[in-house]
Amino acid sequence: MALLAITALAGMDLAQWQALLNNVAFAISLGAMLFYWGGAAFPQMQLLAELGLAGMIGANLTMAALLTARWIDAGYFPLSNLYESLFFLAWGITALHLLALHWSRSRWVGVMTAPVVTGIVAFAALVLPEDMQVAQPLVPALQSNWLMMHVTVMLLAYAALLVGSLLSISFLIVTRGQEVHLKGNSLGLQFRPPQPQTHPEWAEATLPSPASELAYAGLRSPRPAPSSAELPPQPAPEGIPWQRLSLAEILDNTSYRLIGLGFPLLTIGIIAGAVWANEAWGTYWSWDPKETWALITWLVFAAYLHARITKGWQGRRPALLASLGFGVVWVCYLGVNFLGKGLHSYGWFF
């Protein structure tokens, strides 16, 4: 039986491999989402979070293989239609998921990003028509070296902004939408001893003890650190436990770093698109719906970064602004295509 399966796989052409990888990517991302949610419901079961992480890595590799097979089959980088761009966006989100997880060590990253990846892959694999899932020759407007430069950078920018915005939404959930005072500044620059790299719980970040601060500074405490039972109970400001406040600070700073990564990519992508538009259509800017919403997206996240850098915003207010940006990115990427008009209308199937 196994030999027959191997023989069948060996005899598949690239189109059949793409269809198989399409379905495998959906199954793995769905499994990762369920594992992450199971780990959230039962935080004592560390294996669930580890399986969720393994699922996201597997989904990332599967989608990379799918895009590579499509690239070889079509002879061009696979970003010519909505199906291909959806899979590239999902791949970018899984990659940035791993980066955000490395920065934060919080399972909230997977709880929030895995459903988005699953939804994107399900939409591409199950909703889009089959003829769009087959590689087609490039339309004349896309036969340019600017295709990879512009579209790739824009989709990576969308991925970074979406993951950063999702972590801002996580911040609002953790703090229950309350205004809280975070110990770090808006830039996330603060002397903090390293957190223990154990498997995180819902409140995975703990406050450092005085002894750990001394050890981090290269000093030794004159006496052993008191145990948690010996320490007096700490009041929880704003009625939120200390552990949640520490987790909220991690989410806030990680969100800020991802948006700080996505914004320059968005800027470069818009500039590259303007240069390409001038070559293809004779004008740098034509107020096409996609161009207009790209500008709106840029302004929203420019306001976010301006408020954090120059006004010192942190916590609830920038999180609300980033949450607004989450919806704006989706309108820019997908929503305007429902209009069925404009220079970017080839991205939809109606």
Swiss-Prot record:
Keywords: Cytochrome c-type biogenesis, Membrane, Thylakoid, Transmembrane, Transmembrane helix. It comes from the Bacteria. It holds the Pfam family Cytochrom_C_asm. The keyword Transmembrane helix applies. It is found in: Cellular thylakoid membrane. Its main location: membrane. GO terms for biological process: cytochrome complex assembly. GO terms for cellular component: plasma membrane-derived thylakoid membrane. One of its GO terms (molecular function) is heme binding. The keyword Transmembrane applies. It is a multi-pass membrane protein. The chain crosses the membrane at residues 23-43, 47-67, 82-102, 108-128, 153-173, 258-278, 293-313, 319-339. May interact with ccs1. Required during biogenesis of c-type cytochromes (cytochrome c6 and cytochrome f) at the step of heme attachment. PANTHER family: CYTOCHROME B_B6 PROTEIN-RELATED, HEME EXPORTER PROTEIN C. Belongs to the CcmF/CycK/Ccl1/NrfE/CcsA family. This is Cytochrome c biogenesis protein CcsA. It comes from Synechococcus sp. (strain JA-2-3B'a(2-13)). The lineage of its organism: Bacteria, Bacillati, Cyanobacteriota, Cyanophyceae, Synechococcales.
